[in-house]
Amino acid sequence: MSNSASPAVGRKLSWVTKLTYALLPLSFTMTTMVMTWQMIYYTQPLAISIGIVTTMLAVGKAIGGFITPIWGYISDRMYSTAFGRKVGRRKGTLLIAAPLNLIFYVLLWVPGMPVWYYLLVNIIYYGVYPGINTVVYSLPSEMTDDSKDRAQLVAVQQIGGGVGGFALSMFNAYLFKIWGADSWEPYFKIAMIYAVLGTVLLVIGALCIKERPYDETTDISSADKGSDEKVGFFGRLVSVFWNFLSVLRIKTFRNYLGIYLSQMTFRTVRGQINAYFIMFVLLLTPAEVSLSTGFSFLFGMVCVVIWATLITKLGGMRAYRLGSWFTIVLFVGIFILGLTHGSMPKATVTLVFTILITLFTLGNSGIVNAQTYVQSFVPDVDELVTGKRREGQYAGIQSTLEVIVNTVVTILVGVILQAVGFQSGADVKTQSPLVVNVLLYMYCGTVVVLALVGILLTYRMHLNEKTHDILVGESARLRNGGSMDDVTEETRKVVEDLAGMPYEKCWGHNNVINVSNKA
């Protein structure tokens, strides 16, 4: 049985395909608006207690996180439906998730509602949104096997996000200037603008993606069934969570996971309190928050091009280490600025911070691009282990972990700030010195410590361009009917090192997908 999805695997991707793929991360301006302004919107114009807001958001994200693995599971198995075989498994998932995301994104910003309303809407929103980012995360692996094309897709993804972030920051600065930032109306109007634009970009991007065709390796449902004719609801439920946990048996994924979590955590902490840091520590205005962020996004587009070139020359892990060391140096500088800004004119503080945060984009871009580049190779290890292409599985896990990290960070930030006496709705100059110091140490210290952790973990990661070529070659040999008995000694060693299990247990001779498989 065939499908109408546009296959790209096995040939070079055109730049038209790569640029239309950029529309998907460009649509993430909707999410950037939530991450940057939602907490401020709830605690400042709506004057809801920060303790209530952080608890509400944490619960919403946590419950949504339990739903997230289902999206990766569905996306991988969309070819088992007539709709999926007609439009494609990734494209079909996006076309289902996009309208749901629009509806609940709009409902997030409705003012004057009771707390239970915001809790419910946040739960549903954080349960729906992963249907989009699980697909976007999976596409570099889905669209091509070529390492250079994957590096370029990762770069295009980052540039798309950078363009969206810059446009949001500049546009927000302009709109806050003419509408003000003291009432709920400006936030609501801005959010509605991004709701429409983001959804249009998302749908157009979805219609243009390329993906793997329906064949033996993308027919995941056959592995789910095993010797059974049909998998029931309870069996599906068990399968979702078994697939979520069983990937930890794969050594490369475990190593990648530590690297991902370290950088994701420090970026989330910084993102959560970025506006508070600039407003309450540096005593700048909301417009200056957007402008500072905007400059970093603009410079980020240049940085992505630089890192895309460096990654192909240095490899993912060495590029990650370089970006991390650069980030550490810059945040030491930001820490010093936070301690000494009181003796500087406001214009000087704004200029110095803008320079430092813009330069941070160079380090952050290296970290994110290297991590995303390496992540695109993890499903190739999984294929050698399971005999199936499960890009959505790993994208779903990553989305779930993103929700979990956001949840934990949201709880901790709220608890810490409330414990030290943070005042919701207060003037920027009326926060206590303790609150200011806590924000300073959280903002800078978290980045420095976790960046060092990430550097140490990269030395445990053995998936590189050389071992990846060996891995992909072996998968292609087995896929084309080759015997596992004919494996070379070099290939066996590479496979066992990356998989973390004996070679004979690979290529589906395990229960990584199906817990009932006795092989």
Residue ranges and their predicted role:
Residues 2-518:
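Membrane-embedded alpha-helical bundles of multi-pass transporters/translocases
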